[in-house]
Amino acid sequence: MRLFGNSKEQGICQVGESDVAVSEIKKDEALLQKMGYKPKLHRTYAFFENFASSFAACDCMSNIRGSFYIGLLTGGPSAYWITYIIAIPLQLISAATMAEVCSALPTAGSLYFWASAAGGKKYGRLIGFIVAWWVVVAWTSFVAVNCQSTTKFIFGELPVFNSGFSVSSSDVKFRAVQWAVGEAILLVCVLLNFIPPKWFRYIFRVSVAVILLDFVLNMIWLPIAVSTKYGFRDEAFMKSTNYDLGKVNNGWSWCLTFFCTARILVGYDAAGHVAEETKNASKTASRGMFYSAFSNAILSTGIIVMFLYCLPPSNVMYELIKSNSQQPFVSFYAYALGKRAHVFMNVVGILGMIFDTSLSIVASSRLVFAVARDGVLPFSGWLRKVDSHGQPTNAVTFIFLISAALLCSNLPSAVAFTSLLSAAAVPTIMAYAAVAFGRLFLSRNDFPKSEWSLGKLSKPFQLITFLWNLFTAVILFSPKAYPVTGKNFNYAPVIFGAITIFGLISWLSIPASRWSTFYDASKLDSNSFDDSSSDKKSLEKAASIAEGSITQII
């Protein structure tokens, strides 16, 4: 990591306007140069694009629907809404903590870079290498999981229309068809990422619009249909429990409902990944991160209440869960809205997931680019290259290749791929905990100041973030079915352990000289860019790079 060192890479700063002023880049390129990096990515995105990257990565609609039935089986309705009430404020505190860090260090490396900084001079390199592998694997897995989840909503239609085609995950022929569809979805999402920034910004807008349309339809159309068909659930149902995990303590079964509710907002760090492409990043990226999490929290509150009250009678509900092994929510929509009418609702959700995946590739590719820029990954020299539009297209290709390979794991065994669901979330959650831990104990008084500051709440929020994310990781590591067998074993701890070992191997094999020395925190203060002569010189140098290397974005 070239934090405050002389970068050997010669980069360009691409901008959308040829008359860019020094004042517009003084808190972006100047801060980036003080972190040791020359600007290479385009910087054309504003608040909305930054906000949309995290808003789509979280997408509470897809997150809730994807695992809603699991919560009903582990603890029941009361466990679901109670754990949600507990989880959402704690997730928002975590988002606020990460947003404060993002404001101080707005770089594409995001969690990797922040963890390195939080680790201090003594442990920064070690923590940075481990977290780098955590988050790269997590975000790459996230892309593959999104594609697979989308296929589940597609094939969930077959039981509704009584198709004779098997949709059992134990059927290798079905898994082959599902794999092919998942790969096709991945290809579409990747191709969208080769659109120049000038036009790609519309993908951000469409993604947010589809999610909001999805929300509005569920808040208006669904309750109207339910009220005329079978009516809303009563208070007794909302207070009921259901422990369907076999021989396991009911208290722990209740806690496992956090598997659904504690991960609703995971992914808000996407705004940090695109920080180097965002104008006035010290403020804009942190605001985009927190407000996207807050917006998803508001939407998820309304939608969870609506879903719980709109569920069909219990005997019908559990029959729907059993009859549609791919995605019970599709059968729920069909029962409530009608066999034909529900298709429109499902198509809106599927489109939302496709756009979500495309924006997740944006975030993950920027992360890969930033980690490769510091030489942490294999083939770093190739991965850190950008195209004429200032986009890391080689990193996008890398995401495509790895995600495609991960999708192939579904061919021999459905169990292996199911474990990716936890593997995609756990490393990110542990990275949140690592950043908070480092700031609390390793760089308590040395971390750069933030423009978006939590003030006196900063330390308490860091402690809460650390403890909460550790608890969440324990939940995601736990078995989800009992007794534990080879078919239902949760491989997330095994995958996480392997990722950590790869991080340690990288730390041991890559010399510290190739990663450079650590930063001087006193010089990395995003609030300290005044009009002093030294800062003017840095700004003029950054402006010179920008003006001398402009490529018009088409």
UniProtKB/Swiss-Prot annotation:
The Gene Ontology CC terms held by the record are: membrane
Q: Which GO terms describe its biological process?
A: gamma-aminobutyric acid transport; transmembrane transport
Report TM segments: 68-88, 95-115, 126-146, 176-196, 206-226, 250-267, 288-308, 343-363, 397-417, 418-438, 457-477, 492-512
Location(s), subcellular: Membrane
Q: Quick check: keyword Transmembrane in the entry?
A: yes
The topology of this chain with respect to the membrane is: Multi-pass membrane protein
Which family does the UniProt entry place this protein in?
Answer: Belongs to the amino acid-polyamine-organocation (APC) superfamily.
Keyword Heme (UniProt): no
In terms of superkingdom, the source organism counts as Eukaryota
Q: InterPro entries in the record, alphabetically?
A: AA/rel_permease1
Q: Which GO terms describe its molecular function?
A: amino acid transmembrane transporter activity; gamma-aminobutyric acid transmembrane transporter activity
Name-wise, this protein is Uncharacterized amino-acid permease C794.03
Keyword terms:
Amino-acid transport, Membrane, Transmembrane, Transmembrane helix, Transport
Please name the source species: Schizosaccharomyces pombe (strain 972 / ATCC 24843) (Fission yeast)
